[in-house]
Every structure is written in structure tokens, then in C-alpha cells.
Regions:
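Non-catalytic accessory regions of SAM-dependent methyltransferases
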Residues: 1-35, 39-42
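Conserved AdoMet
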Residues: 32-72
């Protein structure tokens, strides 16, 4: 899966629960913590292939956010 697809998956998973701006903030924060990517890197490397374990991590984060657990 490409980074851009992961971003779309993440956003679609949280739409209706959080505002778009907050979803973007969550995504950038998680990418910073888990992938060591800055916001600009996400734009530049949008075609980057994401390993399955990273996708699974983002799925878990979505589930936790749907339960309104804070990101730490």
C-alpha cells in the first residue's frame, strides 16, 4: 500500500467522528512517531510503499480513536 492510500484509508475511517483538520493532525502525528516522517515528507513521498505491519498499526490506531482514546 502506498502512503497516500494509507492516508485516505485513515481519513475515511475517522470521517464523521472527528473534523477533517483533526484527522489530518492525527495522521501527521502518527506518521511522525511511527514512520519518522515529517509533514513535508508525507507530501513528497506519497508513493512510498508502506509495509503490512504499518498498515495493521494504523488500523489499530483507527479503532482506538473510534473509542475516543487519546493518542500518546
Amino acid at each position: 500500500m502506498q502512503l497516500k492510500s494509507l492516508q485516505n484509508f485513515f481519513k475515511n475511517g475517522l470521517l464523521g467522528y472527528y473534523p477533517n483538520e483533526e484527522i489530518d493532525t492525527f495522521f501527521y502525528r502518527i506518521c511522525s512517531m511511527h514512520l519518522k516522517l515529517k509533514r513535508i515528507d508525507i507530501s513528497i513521498k506519497s508513493e512510498m510503499i508502506i509495509p503490512n505491519h504499518t498498515f495493521e498499526y494504523f488500523e489499530m490506531v483507527i479503532e482506538r480513536l473510534l473509542n475516543y482514546e487519546p493518542i500518546q
